Amino acid sequence: MDIEDEENMSSSSTDVKENRNLDNVSPKDGSTPGPGEGSQLSNGGGGGPGRKRPLEEGSNGHSKYRLKKRRKTPGPVLPKNALMQLNEIKPGLQYTLLSQTGPVHAPLFVMSVEVNGQVFEGSGPTKKKAKLHAAEKALRSFVQFPNASEAHLAMGRTLSVNTDFTSDQADFPDTLFNGFETPDKAEPPFYVGSNGDDSFSSSGDLSLSASPVPASLAQPPLPVLPPFPPPSGKNPVMILNELRPGLKYDFLSESGESHAKSFVMSVVVDGQFFEGSGRNKKLAKARAAQSALAAIFNLHLDQTPSRQPIPSEGLQLHLPQVLADAVSRLVLGKFGDLTDNFSSPHARRKVLAGVVMTTGTDVKDAKVISVSTGTKCINGEYMSDRGLALNDCHAEIISRRSLLRFLYTQLELYLNNKDDQKRSIFQKSERGGFRLKENVQFHLYISTSPCGDARIFSPHEPILEGSRSYTQAGVQWCNHGSLQPRPPGLLSDPSTSTFQGAGTTEPADRHPNRKARGQLRTKIESGEGTIPVRSNASIQTWDGVLQGERLLTMSCSDKIARWNVVGIQGSLLSIFVEPIYFSSIILGSLYHGDHLSRAMYQRISNIEDLPPLYTLNKPLLSGISNAEARQPGKAPNFSVNWTVGDSAIEVINATTGKDELGRASRLCKHALYCRWMRVHGKVPSHLLRSKITKPNVYHESKLAAKEYQAAKARLFTAFIKAGLGAWVEKPTEQDQFSLTP
């Protein structure tokens, strides 16, 4: 092989090898190495085999080599200001200096730019800033911003990415508002939300104003930026402070266990009072400011679709997030009061639930009706054939039974005398019986998603850091005051409606059509968790359970879905009152709109032929701003319950369904049947919604509620037709008891 061939073969490695400092391996005297040395140290240069590359003139005794470049660490993409954004939309614009005034040390420049035949002027202490202001005015001409002059100044004209101050983060994300994109064609904006049928997440371009965007401005569409670290920006407190300087934030309260504190801060803006809660005061201030920005300046935060509240189809008297946070705070605060600020041994819990009642539009008037804890069911050997044991001690089930006690109390209050009728939540119905007074609503709070279908597919809180949507520079302002087309079933409240930018990565339910979705599930006896129902397990027998068969109890998701059809009043109370439904279901953690809405009502949307006044209730579904921390450790074997009017909590052994002394609970079937019998003796027969003569046996009294039983039958049929399984009922012997000894 000749020298030329060897040079060609080694040329590919020359760039790398020539970066070496050969001075380290050369003789110190500069003499030429021998053949042996050259063969070992040859770098493929032109000196031939066994020879080093000769030093070049001017090298000062050193081999000539290129310094290795350091690889730059990629930093955050710098934000695009209005000038850059306008140049991308309309390249080649000419800016003209109109005037320069003021003293030498403080000049004022005025620049102008012509866009689509319209001239926009901007002023500033430098030509650059004057051009920037002119570009901003040009952008505003075709992107409609309410309160643009104030808010754009406060935003500092930074690129923004989607963030969520309702997340479970202690520190604020750097930026607040979503950017805008120029769509290919003008489309009216819509509200983005989520329901069980169709999960809407805007992954395409959105028009930002009701007026059509000129075709000349709509081309070319701006590309979606890939994920990148968010640039520095301003949090809600900073923005609100620039819009309304000098605001004072007040500390209202502190609640919660030591590992899951919740602070409440307030601020008054333009005479309006706003509250915010968070795991620290800083976060609580931010959420109070966020509420003010939404209400007064119409500035709304983005949320990933699965975390957005899903509004009710009925009367909605409150702003969803405000209501959710208030209900959560009230239930947690009451539980703290009942357990000596969480220091009592019975404050230990896995799940906390409660029912809150509102009687108007002001959540300040909300009242806690019941509070409960618990995660376990009765052991089959402790079943009672006299209705003296609680079968299901899960917190949300106990809270609903506590609510029944309150309803009986309110009925008795109405039946006492005319003066007490005004204080009762009930009034006579023109259709017979009683109904709730106008604007009386009940809200169910659960510290985590209910067991069963709602929880099984959303076992973790979403990681919001990886679930942001990125759009082009600019600020997106959502003018929800104007009438905009909106898909049915999505957000109807402007304060919670948000536009989603392209690229939202947190998925909704990726596999909504899988067979496992929506299946009826049963709880595990004396344990936690649920399993799907078996096709042949719809009937349980008393002797079979006593001989060792597992006692099956339907999951909380399934029971709440049942309440959304037959009502929360149950069969006995339905003889007196019209169906009562929860107006909202609020989760303290593990909220996922798609899974929760499916579990609560979407999976039985095929239900039909319901009796009069019965319906498929679709309550408000929402998480809370400050998601509750996970409760670690083993679940306690006890359940706690309290109803308004009680002096103290009642502690029940979930395994036996009775208290530690073996006494029956005030929530057991026997106790509630006693309350029903007492009310039945006071209600005139013409006010009964279902006629029943000489009630004696608990089971027969329940069957007398004909319309309720018909609605329940339609519900069970809907589950079967949807292929979700058959409802598993308890052994009938449990209900074959009377109050007479």
From Swiss-Prot:
Gene Ontology CC: cytoplasm; cytosol; nucleolus; nucleoplasm; nucleus; synapse
Localization per record: Nucleus; Nucleus, Nucleolus
Active-site residue list: E396 (proton donor)
EC class: hydrolase
Residues reported in the UniProt entry to bind 1D-myo-inositol hexakisphosphate: R400, R401, K559, R562, K669, K702, K712, K730
Impact upon substituting R603Q: In NEDHYMS; decreased protein stability; strong decreased editing activity
Effect of A722V: In NEDHYMS; uncertain significance; mild decreased editing activity
This enzyme's EC code(s): 3.5.4.37
Top-rank taxon: Eukaryota
Chain residue ranges for the region called Disordered: 1-79, 486-518
Positions of the DRBM domain: 78-144, 231-298
Entry keyword set: Antiviral defense, Disease variant, Hydrolase, Immunity, Innate immunity, Intellectual disability, Metal-binding, mRNA processing, Nucleus, Phosphoprotein, Repeat, RNA-binding, Zinc
Biased composition (Polar residues): 493-503
TM stretches of this protein: none
Span list, region Interaction with substrate RNA: 83-88, 104-105, 237-242, 259
Modified residues (Phosphoserine): S26, S149
Co-factor remark: Binds 1 myo-inositol hexakisphosphate (IP6) per subunit.
List of residues binding Zn(2+): H394, C451, C556
Catalytic reaction list: adenosine in double-stranded RNA + H2O + H(+) = inosine in double-stranded RNA + NH4(+)
Quaternary data: Homodimer. Homodimerization is essential for its catalytic activity. Can form heterodimers with isoform 5 of ADAR/ADAR1.
Protein name: Double-stranded RNA-specific editase 1
Organism: Homo sapiens
Encoding gene (name): ADARB1
